[in-house]
Amino acid sequence: SFTHYVNRFRIEEAIRLLSDPNNETPMKAISAELGFNSISTFYNLFQSSVGMTPSQYRNKVMELQKEQ
């Protein structure tokens, strides 16, 4: 469906933004930038799609960058 397509695009864009270790944009701003009405909707959709919250994902990226 169209909604599924849009949400998949939003999550892919969130992953791209959160994968940049230099991006310190607050989650609330990322959520709003991607068109979510609430940060909880963003967190829930991200977690159901990726298997972790956006914050956990960002922290994991940071840890992996430090190891390199």
Question: What residues fall within each predicted segment?
Answer:
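Alpha-helical DNA-recognition elements
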Residues: 48-49, 60
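Short hydrophobic/aromatic patch on the recognition helix
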Residues: 41-42, 46
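Terminal helix-turn-helix DNA-binding modules in bacterial transcription factors
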Residues: 1-34, 60-68
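Residues within helix-turn-helix
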Residues: 25-29, 39-40, 55
